[in-house]
Amino acid sequence: MLFPSIIAGLKHRGIRMAKKEKIEFPKIEWRDFSPAPIIGVDEVGRGCLAGPVYAAAVIFKSDALNDLVTDSKLLSEKRREELADLILKEHIVGIGSASVEEIDEINILNASLLAMKRAVEKLGVKSGHVLVDGNKKIPNLKGFEQSTIVKGDLRVAPISAASIVAKVTRDRLMKDLGVKYPHYGFEIHKGYSTPVHKQSIVDHGPCIAHRRSFAGVKEYV
């Protein structure tokens, strides 16, 4: 790390510090994939200490929301709720999940892929091209072509739509768990590893909604 005095000296001598380059992820024309239908898939909740992992799969029936959706993490809660309702109304959506018990049994990566598989199966279609956010294809998904797209939730509208639906659906569940287990604040942090959440585990121990294989939880089982 350069001290401020050194940086100031370099600037005085006309030496410019290189700026950290921002990596751009261009939009992808998802309609160019085949065969139809094109299915966007994403999951939410992988990094949480509590609650299931959720996934959604979306087939666009029109371009009505193509330019409105983006990664769910970049939207306000109110806007996510509005868009999720529109997506569910206007498009074909499948929602899947993997339980806390499944996460602890098969690990979070495999549970996330299982949730995505279940979401695709809920669509009621037997073939198509699945665009998966990330770099892992969905195992044992028969009858479908698959492509993985890094940062797909920013680059592919159906994946963005899936991320929105998955997050809103999971957030609603975590709010319900917050009522059922009031010591943990699930309705606020949605199960993520915040200082308040971690301290509540120290103070009260894990509840049935916690992932007992995760660091930050297993130490208090």
From Swiss-Prot:
It is found in: Cytoplasm. InterPro entries: RNase_HII, RNase_HII/HIII, RNase_HII/HIII_dom, RNaseH-like_sf, RNaseH_sf. The keyword Mitochondrion does not apply. A divalent metal cation binds at residues 42-43, 133. Manganese or magnesium. Binds 1 divalent metal ion per monomer in the absence of substrate. May bind a second metal ion after substrate binding. It catalyses: Endonucleolytic cleavage to 5'-phosphomonoester. One of its GO terms (biological process) is mismatch repair. GO terms for molecular function: manganese ion binding; RNA binding; RNA-DNA hybrid ribonuclease activity. Its main location: cytoplasm. SUPFAM superfamilies: Ribonuclease H-like. Its EC number is 3.1.26.4. Keywords: Cytoplasm, Endonuclease, Hydrolase, Manganese, Metal-binding, Nuclease. Pfam families: RNase_HII. Residues 36-221 form the RNase H type-2 domain. The keyword Membrane does not apply. Its cofactor is Mn(2+); Mg(2+). Endonuclease that specifically degrades the RNA of RNA-DNA hybrids. Belongs to the RNase HII family. This is Ribonuclease HII.
